[in-house]
From Swiss-Prot:
InterPro entries: Chitin_synth, Nucleotide-diphossugar_trans. It catalyses: [(1->4)-N-acetyl-beta-D-glucosaminyl](n) + UDP-N-acetyl-alpha-D-glucosamine = [(1->4)-N-acetyl-beta-D-glucosaminyl](n+1) + UDP + H(+). One of its GO terms (molecular function) is chitin synthase activity. Residues 1-32, 85-240, 719-720, 767-816 are cytoplasmic. Residues 54-63, 262-697, 742-745 are extracellular. Belongs to the chitin synthase family. Class IV subfamily. This is Chitin synthase 1. It comes from the Eukaryota. Its EC number is 2.4.1.16. It holds the Pfam family Chitin_synth_2. Glycans are attached at N319, N664. It is found in: Cell membrane. Keywords: Cell membrane, Cell wall biogenesis/degradation, Glycoprotein, Glycosyltransferase, Membrane, Sporulation, Transferase, Transmembrane, Transmembrane helix.
Length: 816
């Protein structure tokens, strides 16, 4: 992506620059790697398959290059799992008595005289039979004047296979003695001279104290083989095996323990929030239906938070009519709200190319009402002749609302105004940045400023400190906003957070059922573990909250809530008055409104496959990545007490499309985080190592599930591999234990079993599909609209249509 210097030089919406002169682009190392890996496929072949433009062709080449790199990762995993022992270790050809398999030989075998031989007779397999064969030793005759007792079989008549080796388990159990690297079996020794030596060193390493002839006699008569030792290859294989095993299992155990600790810690009831920190409740709409939008706005309107300190902002991303809807999304939102519809379209600079870079939006200000009927307790009434009747109470909720409808420029015909969710978010992010830094504004910025002042005259627009972002199909629990704001007020290091997303349609289909446990462990295991270090790598866009800015005094104390040290400063004085106050000097640190964040997030030239996966498919996750990279000393956390509900895909094709976007954006964002050296921890005990392991684990998921099934089959049919099996039980068992402990609900055992049965889908089908569609940047079946497939022609951007002025200039013009 962009360097820090390029980010700061990146033109924001406050400046208009001349189109840059054409120049040859610098080709980086990845471009050269891509061309090298796909050099056997010429461009004319790609044109035959419909890939006509250079951008599409290079995106396809990047996809193939990435798939080749992923395949290499699979080979590395397979080699470390199976190939290392087979190739490196077994090349030593050591015949260890305890590891011999009868089926590995063409006939009967016998172990004797330090070797293994083929024989026609039957001998106990794996035992030492040296005593059965005749042995003559000149050293024995010199030492004792006779030969020691031995068998009468002639070993010279047998075919020798190889030397025999004994491991220490056999040596100790059979009472053998080791001297040097040689193993001796004194079990059939009857010579009194050797009796004390045999008794003293049985099963251990001996230290002989005999003369030369006596010891040579002992060697000739009782030699049984050599000590089984590991070759350098075996040592390397074992070292790699235990390093990976300890690392993976250590990460699993650590995640479990820290996830449990964080769950317990987060359950501590926080102090009640005064609920006076000004908050924006942002809802981004695209093609959602009326019911989904209404449920979301109702839930935000009913938030248990001060009426004067919250403002709902709905941004409709173009004149879009969702599939199955009778009205466009802007008409649905306006129909649900009590707003002034007499709004003029105002221009701004959008995140796209050509004529579409000039976009317009209408800003409607008003109120959103919810009338809810609640049943109270039953009572007996006289007209009911003693029967019980229900009494009902009507509760009315009212919240200020600002509707921003991106309507497009006059030349647009299809999907007028549609510029994407990232463009909608940057509208507000850049608006607050311009207020804080005093930068020039567009007409749309000033329109938003005026409507905010009209709706909330007691608050300056720059006084908003937090922004809650939700999708238009999310239902937020009534206490979620106050819980999240309270975290901001009590911990100034927290700059972003997410809550728990729960599934509403659990039993709609098998597709929804397999997602229940996956959603739960992604929050209470992964995000809880990351929260301990303050580095949640993904704050989901459907339900998250960010600081717009942090205001502190000179001692670093927050000024965003009631504080004794701030008694002399009015609560809702404007940002400029706070900064210029002679009573107490304050410091303002922009977070979401920081130019480093906005400029990197609003990159216009998105050319590479990596950039497109970051900014077109995973913009919410990339915003989290930018915050981690920029504010690495602050915290992004998961708050389990703040909850929301949503509907998940009920059809497999929709799930496939959704997870394609999520998996691909995850890979590219993790690659960005791998390059951040300032994450929490150091070396082997750092979040950077965890990110590396998660990235590699994501890439090898399909291969890992295949190897898992192979391991299970081998364990059942041949011999159990206990260490991998224990690790497998830990991977699937510990999350279930964690969830049972944290929820105390037995139903999650059922959801865990459903999830385990669907592991091939999660670990093979979805990742494999996502990898092969690296170059697909569409939203697929996740968001369908009527008339999909049409596109307006792209012309040249006319910057003269955009009016950019200082706020004071706009105000003076408006007051004339």
């Amino acid at each position: 992506m962009l360097s820090q210097g390029e980010i700061l030089r990146n033109p924001s919406r406050t400046r208009l620059q001349r189109p840059p002169k054409s120049r040859s682009e610098r080709k980086g190392w990845w471009y050269r790697v891509t061309i090298f890996l796909t050099c056997l496929i010429p461009n004319f072949m790609l044109r035959c398959f419909g890939m006509t433009t250079p951008e599409v062709q290079h995106a396809w080449r990047e996809k193939v290059a990435l798939c080749i790199c992923i395949f290499f990762c699979w080979i590395i995993l397979g080699f470390t799992t199976y190939g290392m022992n087979t190739i490196i270790c077994k090349g030593s050809n050591q015949y260890v008595a305890s590891r011999l398999k009868r089926d590995a030989f063409d006939g009967n075998t016998v172990i004797a005289n330090g070797g293994i031989y083929y024989t026609d007779d039957e001998y106990a397999f794996g035992e030492n039979h040296t005593y059965a064969f005749e042995k003559k030793s000149g050293a024995c005759k010199l030492a004792f004047g006779r030969q020691l007792p031995s068998g009468d079989e002639d070993i010279d008549d047998l075919e020798r296979i190889n030397d025999i080796y004994w491991d220490w388990g056999d040596i100790m159990s059979k009472g053998m003695i080791v001297v040097g690297n040689k193993v001796y079996d004194p079990s059939y020794c009857t010579e009194p001279l050797f009796e004390e030596f045999n008794r003293k060193y049985a099963g251990t390493e001996g230290k002989p104290d005999f003369d030369t002839d006596e010891w040579r006699c002992y060697e000739d008569m009782f030699y049984a083989g050599k000590v089984a030792t590991k070759t350098p290859g075996c040592l390397l294989a074992d070292t790699m095996f235990w390093i990976t095993t300890i690392s993976i299992f250590g990460l699993i155990i650590t995640k479990f323990l820290l996830g449990f600790f964080y769950s317990w810690y987060a359950k501590r009831r926080p102090k009640p929030s005064p609920k006076i920190t000004p908050c924006i409740l942002l809802v981004t709409c695209y093609s959602e239906g009326k019911d989904g939008i209404k449920n979301t706005l109702d839930s935000l309107c009913k938030q248990d938070y001060g009426y004067d300190y919250k403002l709902i902002v709905v941004i409709c991303d173009g004149n879009i009519t969702g599939s199955g809807n009778s009205m466009s999304t802007p008409d649905i939102v306006l129909g649900l709200s009590d707003v002034d519809r007499r709004a003029e379209p105002k221009g701004y600079i959008s995140l796209t190319h050509g004529t579409k870079r000039y976009n317009r939006a209408k800003v409607h200000a008003g109120y959103y009402h919810v009338r809810e009927e609640k049943k109270s307790r039953r009572y007996r009434c006289w007209p009911c002749f003693g029967r019980q009747a229900d009494s009902s109470e009507v509760e009315n909720y009212k919240t200020r609302i600002l509707v921003i409808n991106k309507c497009g420029n006059p030349s647009e015909t299809f999907k007028a105004g549609n510029r994407g969710k990232r463009d909608s978010q940057v509208i507000l992010m850049s608006f607050f940045s311009k207020l804080i830094y005093g930068d020039r504004m567009t007409e749309l910025d000033f329109e938003i400023y005026q409507k905010m002042k009209f709706l909330m005259p007691h608050i300056e627009p720059e006084d908003f400190e937090c922004i809650l972002m939700v999708d238009a199909d999310t239902i937020v629990k009534p206490d979620a906003l106050s819980i999240m704001v309270n975290v901001f007020e009590t911990d100034q290091k927290v700059i972003g957070m997410c809550g728990e997303t729960m599934i509403l349609n659990k039993f709609e289909s098998w597709v929804t059922m397999i997602q229940v446990f996956e959603y739960y462990i992604s929050h209470h295991l992964s995000k809880a573990f990351e929260s301990v270090f303050g580095g949640v790598t993904c704050l989901p866009g459907c339900f998250c909250m960010y600081r717009i800015k942090i205001v502190t005094n000179q001692q670093g104390q927050l000024l965003s809530g009631p504080s004794k040290s701030r008694a002399s400063v009015p609560r809702f004085s404007s940002m400029k008055s706070i900064l210029s106050s002679s009573l107490e000097k304050s410091l303002c640190l922009p977070i979401l409104a920081n130019p480093a964040i906005i400029n990197a997030y609003s990159v216009l030239e998105v050319k590479t496959l990596h950039q497109k996966n970051l900014l077109h498919l995973g913009e919410d996750r990339y915003l989290t990545t930018l915050l981690l990279k920029t504010f690495y000393r602050r915290k992004l956390v998961f708050i389990p007490a703040a909850k929301c509900e949503t509907y998940v895909p009920g059809e497999f094709s929709v799930l496939l499309s959704q997870r394609r976007r999520w998996i691909n954006s995850t890979i590219h964002n993790l690659f960005e985080l791998v390059q951040v050296n300032n994450l929490c921890g150091a070396f082997c005990f750092s979040m950077q190592l965890v990110v590396v392991m998660e990235l590699f684990g994501t890439l090898v998921l399909p291969a890992a599930i295949i190897f898992t099934f192979v391991m299970i089959a081998v364990s059942i049919l041949i011999e159990p591999a206990w260490v991998p099996l224990i690790m497998l039980v830990g991977i699937f068992g510990l999350p279930a234990v964690l969830i049972l402990i944290t929820t105390m609900e037995i139903q999650y055992v059922f959801w865990c079993l459903v999830y385990i049965l669907s592991i091939p889908i999660w670990n093979f089908v979805l990742p494999t599909y996502a990898f092969w569609h690296f170059d697909n940047f569409s939203w697929g079946d996740t968001r369908k609209v009527d008339g999909e497939g049409k596109e307006d022609e792209e012309g040249e951007f006319d910057h003269t249509k955009i009016r950019i002025r200082e706020l004071e200039e706009f105000l003076s013009e408006a007051n004339k």
